[in-house]
Amino acid sequence: MSSLTQLVADELAQPVDPRVRDMAEALAAKYPSASQAVLFYGSCLRESQLEGLMLDFYLIVSSYEAAYGKGWLARANRLIPPNVFPFEHQGLMAKYAVLSEADFHRLNGPETRNVSVWARFSQPARLVWSADKDAMTKAIEAVSRAAPTLLAAAGSIDGEAPLDWWRRAFALTYSVELRAERKSRSSSVVDAGPARYERFSIPAMAAIPVGAKAGGWARRRVEGKLLSVARLAKAAFTYSGGIDYLAWKI
């Protein structure tokens, strides 16, 4: 196991609020024949008062057919991943995104220009539930691809401090998507845990593939905003209260 993979595994294994664990288990139980892993991420990781907040999960499934059958939801999830749904458990509210194991691996890596998954999983997350050891290993391996992909896409600048590289990289990803957050949000991601990003810097840089190409951000912005619109339009049908969700996201 590489030093980066070990860092990711250790971080994903950190404990969470028992209510988050219970929610993840209940979410996995909704898809008993498909669920492989449930990851918890986002700003709520740093919160102890969860009431009134919207928690964020990724549900990783073996396949979309195993999750939904052969209907339109499986086709929509494959065509424009992920599908996003609301979830409520024991008074807590969440939204969860569904990806297959194959898509989760692919979307965390440099083979996709879209930033949405690898930008999120370059940040702290928790692997709250997994079906078995194999599912856990696959989730760790997928998440381990995210940070090198982020830094490689941003490209290095001579003399730039590691934390500034992270800040610049996140700023680039925030410019790609339709987001309601303030522009300063990209810097606050790093500033909320600078020691974490310092610790990840050298292993993540070492894991950047040889010959990795930086740049292409003008194209990413055009494609990213179009994809964001397509995902939001799809969410109007998959997400209960879809119009309210659209307004909140925009």
Language-model region placement:
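Catalytic core of pol beta-like nucleotidyltransferases
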Residues: 1-30, 34, 39, 45-51, ...
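Short hydrophobic/aromatic beta-strand micro-patches
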Residues: 58-60
